[in-house]
Structures are given as structure tokens and as C-alpha cells.
Amino acid sequence: MAMEDQSAARSIGKVSWFSDGKGYGFITPDDGGEELFVHQSSIVSDGFRSLTLGESVEYEIALGSDGKTKAIEVTAPGGGSLNKKENSSRGSGGNCFNCGEVGHMAKDCDGGSGGKSFGGGGGRRSGGEGECYMCGDVGHFARDCRQSGGGNSGGGGGGGRPCYSCGEVGHLAKDCRGGSGGNRYGGGGGRGSGGDGCYMCGGVGHFARDCRQNGGGNVGGGGSTCYTCGGVGHIAKVCTSKIPSGGGGGGRACYECGGTGHLARDCDRRGSGSSGGGGGSNKCFICGKEGHFARECTSVA
């Protein structure tokens, strides 16, 4: 069994960082030595085991089984127990996610999200943190990000997910100022070209419900075919061509008039028996003529 080589001498230092949520922190020795790792289980306390930033503590130095030094038997100066209260050490929900200090939350932090204590500066506290969805930096969540809609601030964020509208990083599609126009995304270029096409305009980078070219029809692209006019880039409910012109393109025949490009429920001639000659392929069961059905036939059987 691996044993820890403990030193009989006790040292004094100050807490440089501690996270209640993670259960560990670091102590800077007063003699200027290297920072020491301290685990929550090594704290001698009458209450909740925690340390406060800048707090003076007394401890022993031990060599762990991993070959690294750490602080154990951490007490108040003089060997007394650290009297920690549950509400005093975690009154604001533990350490701030931005700067690591206690007493406030990340959304109220004045330290920002720079690389000094929690950012992507390669320090000991950057490795385990997730990346902000807005700017790509570490040390805070997207809801606390101060670069919410910038676009320019997150461009080099590395690791930020691309905006669904413009393909850039640093913001979400709902906050995008680039819109879904053709100048940035409509041409199919950029990193979003492999996405599904908008059902309205055929472009990529946005959904039909967010499309700004609702009735366009001239954008083309890979959209689905309109049931009314046979064109692409929009759906039948927003089509401005109620009756197809020319060779209406492969639609089913309307049950009311026999024409193509629309359904019976949308037919402009619904219920009128005078609309013969619709070009339909169905014949009236009563008179044998095309253009109407038996229920609308005016001929006496």
C-alpha cells in the first residue's frame, strides 16, 4: 500500500483559490514556495469544509502517491479548527464561476471573463471548464457572457459553435445581426453550405419560419416544390399564384375543377358548376363530360 511521506514541520500560507463545487483548491506558502494542492477532505473544520480566498492557514506538507506535494491537516494558524459556517462560505452559491472568488455570482462579477483567473490562459483552472457558447472563451456560461451579440469579438474564439444564420462564431442565431440574406449565406458558400435548405427560399443557414424572403419564389435553390404553382423556394400556403400558368408541373388534379397546382379546399371555383374546361382528366359520372364531377352536374340523368 502506498504511504504518504509526511513532514513533521507545519507551514503557514494563504489560500490562493478554492472551489466548493470542485472540492479542492491551492495554497501559496508564505515562504515563497510552490503552490500546494489542497483537497476538501484535508481541511480540519467544525462545520462545512471550505477555504476563503486570501485566508491564512496552517498545514503539513505531504508527498502523495502520485509524487506531487500537497497540503494536509489544514487548520487555522496555531492549529485551531477552521470554524466554517454553511451559510458564510456558500452564501452566494460558492465560488464565482468567472474569477473564483466567493461572495458573488458570475453574472455580478466585475472581474469579467479574461484569462487572469479562469479564462483560457492555460493556467491550472482552465482545463476543466466548458466553453461559453457565445464567445468561445472558458470561465463562464453563455447566459453570463458580456459579448452576447458582437460577432466580431468571438470570431477567433476557437471552439465556439457557429451561428446557424451566418456561420460565424460568437453568437446564437436568435441574436444574429447578419440575418439570412443572400449576401452572407444565401449564395450557398461558407461553412453552412452543407445544411438543409430553407423551405421558403432554398437557402441554408435558417429555417422557413425565420425566412425574410417569404414569397420570393425567384431564389430557387434546393427547396421543395410548391404544390400550387410547381415552383421551388416557397410552399403553397404563401404562393401568390393561385392558378398555375402554363405547364403547371406535375401536380395532382383538383377534385373540384380538375385543374392542377392546388387542392380542392383551396379551389377558387369550389361549389360552382360553371367551371368546365378545367383541363382535368376526370369525367362526370352523369353526363360523361370533363370539368366537373357528378355531384355538380346540371344535366338531368
Swiss-Prot record:
CSD domain: which residues? 13-76
The organism's superkingdom is given as Eukaryota
Where N-acetylalanine occurs, the residues are A2
Q: Where are the zinc fingers (CCHC-type)?
A: 94-111, 130-147, 161-178, 196-213, 224-241, 252-269, 282-299
* Free-text tissue specificity from the UniProt record: Mostly expressed in shoot and root apices, and siliques, and, to a lower extent, in roots, cotyledons, stems, shoots, leaves, floral buds and flowers.
Q: Which organism is it from?
A: Arabidopsis thaliana
UniProtKB keywords: Acetylation, Chaperone, Cytoplasm, DNA-binding, Metal-binding, Nucleus, Repeat, RNA-binding, Zinc, Zinc-finger
Q: Which GO terms describe its molecular function?
A: DNA binding; mRNA binding; zinc ion binding
| PANTHER family assigned to the protein according to its UniProt record, in alphabetical order | COLD SHOCK DOMAIN PROTEIN 2, COLD SHOCK DOMAIN-CONTAINING PROTEIN 4
The record's note on quaternary structure and interaction partners says: Interacts with PTAC16, PABN1, PABN2 and PABN3.
Stated role: Chaperone that binds to RNA, single- (ssDNA) and double-stranded (dsDNA) DNA, and unwinds nucleic acid duplex. Promotes freezing tolerance.
Provide the phenotype resulting from gene inactivation. Sensitive to freezing.
- Supply one GO BP term: response to cold
Can you say what this protein is called?
Cold shock domain-containing protein 3
